[in-house]
């Protein structure tokens, strides 16, 4: 049992060094034969051994040999002999974790409420009001304009037309918002996050479909990646995953669809305020018959300017006013509907018979087909229900829609149908014309307030969508302001806010009526709906593992309906849809150019990364000097040494005493727990204090902490990484250490006047084992070492070394490359990269501006990369 005793002694000795002792259950001794028989037991032990071995050997995190071999290994196993002379190995029984607990910085995580959480009555009522204001504001405005747009091109010819149109509206309202979104799509959320990019992120987390190959194997062990589905037992799900991962065409198609859907969603966010406010203010012509359309447009412009001017201040405190306002609005919708049904008779209830839809198309097929675009407006806001899901549990949203929102909307449409049956010549301002005269002005004011709330809700959803797209590399970086300390999802993007305002005003001033704006509205809504159908279908196949019958039923039913609606809306392209198509195309081009240029830039950086051999040559040739301080080298690549470091050495042949290659990586999850933020590994041998650090953020996280906080977190994480590394090395067998390790190499260590330590004229990647004590100036020593004592001494010295480097200050080395197309590239590539992408890069927010780094601590290296 000599080996066991040695391991125990090592652990005991290391405990005096201030390190956290590894639990004994993580390790066990096995015979070599037993280990060989169990080689096929799974990748867990092998991956763990590889991770420990890589640390023990001082392996490079980014070396080219390790890019595709992270699951191999065996290098972390200690060897010894049992009582019978049997060869034994010390192996891990649990996976080696390469992320480390980091404490001290409190992040205000969005308080998404789980379905299982119990609420008291007061909390429930507060959430009910918040849900109305945040989730259902957009769909609650649809009764203002649905019938107006449906009957804008052809007059009502009889009761059958009204019943047919009303039946279309009722069943569209039931099929799209209720069945598709509330009952199905809401369950496709990404840990509570909704929206088109959340669907894409969910797929990216379960299949490697991203075009930028910056995934890290260890991310699969993050808590957010621990999904129960898909299970490997279902062959269909595995085949779908393999097909998506192996086909470059499918990857590009998925990305193209999500970019198209996002462009349509942003366009929807521009049309919604224009349509909502303009239709609400248009009621003024019913109360004041002499009011002109110019007055309506002017008032709408003023209201929109006020709305976007206070958008930044519309935080959760305003929920106390917005929620009750929407509750009053829905009650008005239901109350007016009941009044009209009691006044004009219950004939509108016949519209629940779907045969009236057939009669409607039979009487005038072309007119009925054209009215489908207007009919879809009753479902506008369905995507906003999903996009604004992050604040509330799914079942709560479902209950609110089924018990309050849907009944009020159905009553409102039934009441308008009853009014139209009795007043078939009134095809304009139907909602306001059906209001009892005694309550007209109060309802008019509440309608305008509800329209403003719906517009604000949609704008907030646009902010969330763009934040997700920026995090996933599909939109230029913008300044993002968090307006609430309690809810992380409440954000404000100044540039986007003013862009939406001017775009919205442009639509209003261009068309000046709800009919032309409504035609564009239908196109935008349908574009988002179709993309949601496609992505939810993929999620059903890949993640939910739904039966093929249910999948086919879902995709055939809803995709067919949406394509029919879409064909009708395309017929009105000349009436107003053309402006939206041009606007959405512009947004799509911006996203495509940014993603395309970013991918080429990343590929160029990967090709230029430095190899170990080149690093060895650079060190001695430049006479590298270790200067006191902490050097943080930022790059986007997750493996290897970035080319910027080589250029830095050529220009200034000196490196700091501690070098950390930092990569800010956005992973396809909403939030990365603070305990899983950093991933560390050594880049070269232990004596030269060079590390790789990947700081991981979700698309909902606040990127990034302040400079001082980030430095503190990084140093704490680095110290814990070194401590854990020393513990794992100490648990290896002493025999293994004696046989495999080279004897320590002497090194000259200098004591600077300020007390800091640094080495002079040392090859960059030479072996270096520091001694336990500070060596006097210009003196050398070769200590006779015991492995356990050496690990303890090296740990203490390295921790002291890091603290001294921290006291000397940190310098940020940032790459600011210029990307250009090669001279022999085709014309359009030169146009995209040299002009459009360069313009976006020069005008977007710099990656490091959010950390508030003092200019005196920043060194920027600008390299020209030809792609």
Curated annotation (Swiss-Prot):
Keyword annotations: Glycoprotein, Ion transport, Membrane, Potassium, Potassium transport, Transmembrane, Transmembrane helix, Transport
Compositionally biased intervals (Acidic residues): 32-44, 63-84
Disordered: annotated segments: 1-88
Pfam families in alphabetical order: K_trans (PF02705), K_trans_C (PF22776)
Gene Ontology CC terms: membrane
Glycosylation sites: 340, 425
Residue intervals on the Extracellular side: 146-167, 274-285, 339-365, 422-433, 512-522, 567-572
Coiled coil regions, renumbered to chain: none
Membrane topology: Multi-pass membrane protein
Compositional bias per record (Low complexity), positions renumbered to this chain: 1-13, 45-54
Cytoplasmic side: 1-124, 189-252, 307-317, 387-400, 455-490, 544-545, 594-867
One of the protein's GO biological processes: potassium ion transport
Record localization: Membrane
Parts of the chain that traverse the membrane: 125-145, 168-188, 253-273, 286-306, 318-338, 366-386, 401-421, 434-454, 491-511, 523-543, 546-566, 573-593
GO molecular function, one term: potassium ion transmembrane transporter activity
PANTHER family documented for this protein: OSMOTIC STRESS POTASSIUM TRANSPORTER, POTASSIUM TRANSPORTER 15-RELATED
NCBIfam families: kup
Function: High-affinity potassium transporter.
Family the UniProt entry places it in: Belongs to the HAK/KUP transporter (TC 2.A.72.3) family.
Name the UniProt record assigns to this protein: Probable potassium transporter 15
Organism: Oryza sativa subsp. japonica (Rice)
Gene coding for it: HAK15
